[in-house]
Design a protein with these regions (language model features):
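P-loop/Walker A NTP-binding region and its immediately flanking N-terminal helices
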Residues: 1-113
């Protein structure tokens, strides 16, 4: 069972994310928003895991078993930063920090995911 199977989001949205992961040139930015407990938070994490998945077949990325997936899901992947806030706005300092992280090159995976 892949990470995608557990998502509680509309099938159309899940399929779009999977297509983007399987693409050799995924969209450069996605922004996931939602209230606490919303399924979109989990979708963002699964999407990040799939982008950093070590499966060679793009159609199988998001396996949930490789080191890349496991590390993203437990929050310890070097190329994954999970940014969340309950505030309506983020501070200038937080925005600057995110921009700095986004400029870093990936260290382990193919992408830097924030």
């Amino acid at each position: 069972m892949s990470l995608w199977d557990s998502l509680l989001i509309p099938e159309r949205e899940r399929d779009q994310l999977r297509r983007d992961v399987a693409s050799s040139r995924p969209t450069h930015a996605w922004l996931f928003t939602g209230t606490a407990g919303a399924p979109h938070r989990e979708a963002a994490k699964v999407f990040a895991a799939a982008l950093l998945c070590e499966q060679p077949d793009p159609q199988n990325r998001g396996c949930g078993e490789c080191k890349g997936c496991v590390n993203v899901m437990n929050g310890s992947h070097a190329d994954f930063t999970h940014f969340r806030t309950e505030a309506t706005n983020i501070s200038i300092e937080e925005a600057r920090e995110l921009v700095m992280k986004a400029q870093d090159r990936p260290t382990v995976g193919r992408w830097r995911v924030i």
